[in-house]
């Protein structure tokens, strides 16, 4: 089965919002073995929408449309699909009741134009919307399948996952099963060299690598009738790659690095406190994104100025005077200071120059020090990072979590 994703909305063409739906839908279709051949975007114009839909139906078996299901006059998706397929729009009483219940629940008056959203093409399969008012639908007609879903991602995504994907999976007969191995501390080119012989002889299980935000993902993919069968076929290759990557491999479940590090702290009851300068609280923010972190996360201190480093963390004035705020020695004293103040098992600290200003020949933009203080001593990682301010800060955070992860691994043997 091949597919086209057709996004409807003038706001997409004007660049007011990004079409993140297409990326999400493509990934989910790939998971069940549906090939996505085209992404299209069209504005809120019935003539152009009709042309795009006809073209999509001509070249694909499946068309998934997002947007244009709302209550206003420029929401034209259902009307256009009904016209193209020769279907009538009929009132779906159950959907109307759900819309009324939604407005009652949020304590808002339901306007008359919202009734429009309960009119659906005759004979369709209704896709319930538990997060908004616009129901979606699936229509099968002359060997083609048209799916209509609302545009807002918080509404579209659960509707796709809970109803549309299971519906389509039954028809495909097989699914694409993928395993994602997440790696940090090895570049993409170095990683490829380490597994090139496996890439050269790949067969039923294919290997792909891609880098993003300082991390590398290895995707292992196969086709199978069931997910269990697919994972079973992938496992030998997964184990071989894991044995080569060793501690650089931090997840086989497509998890974020900060989540893995935080879970290791929680599972091993290792308490932590943080001291941040150039990252301005990003480490603390990402820690607190992880459920259960309150068991081990004591506090986070943002010590941006030299005065704050001395007053809040006990960094020595002579250290700052001799070595500067961005130095290995200052990072060490920050980590040791926050660990002592909080009485935690480990203290994590970062200091650096994120730019775009503040760099010198001796200490350029991108120079960062990450320090981890623990019962065995204090270790420091010097980083020379490239990119804009946001990238440098993000890579600093990832390196900090990587230090924590590797420390816990070493501690537990």
UniProtKB/Swiss-Prot annotation:
CDD domains documented for this protein? cinA
InterPro entries assigned: CinA, CinA-like_C, CinA_C, CinA_KH, Competence-induced_CinA, MoaB/Mog-like_dom_sf, MoaB/Mog_dom
Q: SUPFAM superfamilies, per this entry?
A: CinA-like, Molybdenum cofactor biosynthesis proteins
Pfam families per the UniProt record, alphabetical: CinA, CinA_KH, MoCF_biosynth
Alphabetized Gene3D superfamilies for the sequence: 3.30.70.2860, CinA-like, MoaB/Mog-like domain
Matches recorded under HAMAP family: CinA_B
Identify its protein family.
Answer: Belongs to the CinA family.
Q: Which NCBIfam families match?
A: cinA_nterm, molyb_syn, PncC_domain, PRK00549.1
Instruction: Provide the protein name.
Output: Putative competence-damage inducible protein
Q: What is the lineage of its organism?
A: Bacteria, Bacillati, Bacillota, Clostridia, Eubacteriales
Tell me the gene name. cinA
